[in-house]
Amino acid sequence: VNRPTPTPPTRLLAIDAGLRAGLAVYTADGRLERYRSTNFGAPSRLKKGVYGVMSAVEGLRRVVVEGGGPVADPWAREAHRRGLSLQRVQAGVWRKALLLPRDRRTGRDAKEQADEIAREVIAWSGAPRPTSLRHDAAEAILIGLWGVLDAGWLPELPESLQPG
């Protein structure tokens, strides 16, 4: 009996690009599945590591990267090579969508607020709770949240995640 192979669930990978990068994976229902911080340590290891990170995300369809230049370009190249939807976003864009103006006055304020909201996203999504949460992972979580909203995977921010 030939049974159709089930298609893997669609996923989005969000990256706070850097040699120390934050990574977050979201499912098509707009919920955070997993997140982490990784230290590539050197540009050569970043270039090699991008392939493995993307290969580990089953059903990857969309990539959202914050950052530019040599730390973001390997992510863009690999996404294009795989035929994935790629979106680059600047911090100011996702912060404006997810943080109140008072929480965006300084980069430090924004990072503190990102950490708080990331923990709320983790709880709302039912993702494993962090023992510690690095700011790059927290920012990747919010980059991904912005990405699923932008893609229409979530029609709007869940009430518990709305600023204010």
Language-model features, listed with the residues they occupy:
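Phosphate- and other anionic-substrate recognition elements at nucleic-acid/protein interfaces
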Residues: 1-164
